[in-house]
């Protein structure tokens, strides 16, 4: 309305309607038209709102809901103005633009008008321009082109702006039908601004449930909001659709950004983990060869399960599978009605908002790189605590991570750092939706502070990743399982009574012929397998054969030096062993000392067991001067052959830093460039060392400590690895050997294991070959285990005594146990034996009521012979597909490096087992 310039004149009262002194204005197309006030009277052109009379509409809100086909529709994002560095949008909505106008009108997702803004002068920058609309900043997202999208936008806007119900306060006034001669509607100025309020009718009776109309359920359901998944399954090639329960409202579909990279076993793994964390029962799959990942099955709930143990072998992509699961749960949820959704019914948030990843400190950088590699850190916020932070800074960072919603979704923290920030995590534990524990076998100790801290957080959804969760201790197995799914195995007392005692008795060599105990142990084992297979997934790296380059495994038996033989004899005589009281624990120090002699006699003098129990000064001096050994000679010859004969890099692994010191000195003397990673290297430097080795072609070797640095590292820059010594725990060696043969490797790989012939090295190797039987049994490697392999402890006290014997008259004690071939490089086929039948027969005969002394002695001899035969059978099964090679008869070892070096090594290598890698085409 235009107000005339004020003039100081005497007051004149306004004239009544009907006066002929009003000024007539020509009607226009606008909703409200006013005329300048002349002599305190106004002429107004009114728009009829009802047929009873003219109305005046003072609302200036633009209405772009007309059926004009020239109107363009856009989706928008809006927010309040902010000075934050990382800005986020607070909501979505629509914008309309009429062809006859240069003004954009903005609405939120509910159709509420936000404001309008003029078009920018440069039409090319339309979608980059930040518009000002009321108190909001608005940016166009994209223009709606599809008819269905435009129709949906019109419906969303009309729900609010086209509401037929009258508002409680009306801005439209009904004017009496009073006409003058000219057909104009006129009113005094005072009446123009005194608007009446239309009040809603209020019933005099109180409305109760009895008076309310009952709406049929079918009608209610028809009006219920429909929800849709984040991704359209029809637009994705080979989608991964998660299973669901009956209460699910939408399908959860893996983001194709990640799904297109997943291999078949990884697709199955992601779906298995999702089922476990969502508490779904395992589906019944009739044909496991059929791909079921593209279909969503409706499963029943399993209230006992809320966690998962992914126990795949190293190199199968556990990290990628975990990242896929994390991203899926952050972005999506099957229960759309419980989260905020877009106006089209698509969930805007996922089931999990904050996820805690706990791992060894050496893997923190690797986890963050993997998130960046697969998702890009602009899509997901990943927080890692800097090693330069003070404890207070770490606590503040954790506090902010939990309380600030949109900046970070994932916190990656080391196991040790977890203890220092446990108080902050405990205070806000209700905000943590999911826990991921990498290298989860570190939690096998029930008294561990780290384990108790994680338990106190009481996070329902848990995912544990490990390559070797169990070896031969059911107590540790219970600790891990009870942490993942508390109470699923009952209390420890009941678990011990029902499972540990029967299974342990069945594995005791003293009860090997007791049919009743063995049957009960087998029954309990099967029962435990049925329970744990609901949430444990275990696959071997045999799956990788068609994805990775071929790998050749070579076991080299190295002849000990004479100085080493003398050291063995002196130590065993000086130890004065009492084999009657000998146990594995009491002899552990002596075992470690003998292992050092296998590496180099020069390590004897600094050994604590040698100093406290033997301490022969004269012998110690002679040992310290003798640094060489059979394995060191073979090692240096191999390194020289690799450097001169190939352009490849090599990793050398040992369990002892003192051994690495000796190897490092020898490499320096030979002019071999190298880097080293062991427990003394600060965590913040480890990633840079690994990256430098993988990328710098000038670095030839990498010295690696198996225990402190052999977990989770990616050393694909090397294609050859030499395992210098063995560990009692086969998982340590397997972890170390898998550093090079993994995703990202482009060259054929060669793994060399060095073993001192006839010494404790061989005994450890034999135990490693058989120690996996319990893991294979409870983790489902059924195709790799013999039914009898888990019924016995493979080493008893007699075997322990044999550890301290040195066989100087053999080329390979291991080969002597399993085979009598000539070592001509052939792969030996072993016929099926009737060993199991003989064992059952001995059991039946041992359960008779009375036995004479002569028969007892005869049965004991038969039992001893049977035990040796069983041990040989187990080792043969572990060495299947290996070729037996005697260097004196055959000089082809299926590796050009060692074959070319045979001239120098014929006197140092006594025997070899070789498993050649088959050429596998990498799946495109």
UniProtKB/Swiss-Prot annotation:
GO cellular component terms listed in the entry, alphabetical order: nucleus
Subcellular location: Nucleus
Glycyl lysine isopeptide (Lys-Gly) (interchain with G-Cter in ubiquitin) cross-link site: 615
GO biological process, one term: reciprocal meiotic recombination
Keywords (A to Z) from UniProt: ATP-binding, DNA damage, DNA recombination, DNA repair, DNA-binding, Helicase, Hydrolase, Isomerase, Isopeptide bond, Meiosis, Nucleotide-binding, Nucleus, Topoisomerase, Ubl conjugation
GO MF, any single term: DNA binding
Domain Helicase ATP-binding: 299-487
Residue segments, region Disordered: 1-21, 155-183
The protein's role, per its UniProt record: Involved in the recombinational repair of double-strand breaks (DSB) in DNA during mitosis and meiosis. Has DNA dependent ATPase activity. Promotes D-loop (displacement loop) formation with RAD51 recombinase. Modifies the topology of double-stranded DNA during the D-loop reaction to facilitate the invasion of the homologous duplex molecule by the initiating single-stranded DNA substrate. Required for adaptation from G2/M checkpoint arrest induced by a double strand break, by participating in monitoring the extent of single-stranded DNA produced by resection of DNA ends.
Name this polypeptide is given: DNA repair and recombination protein RDH54
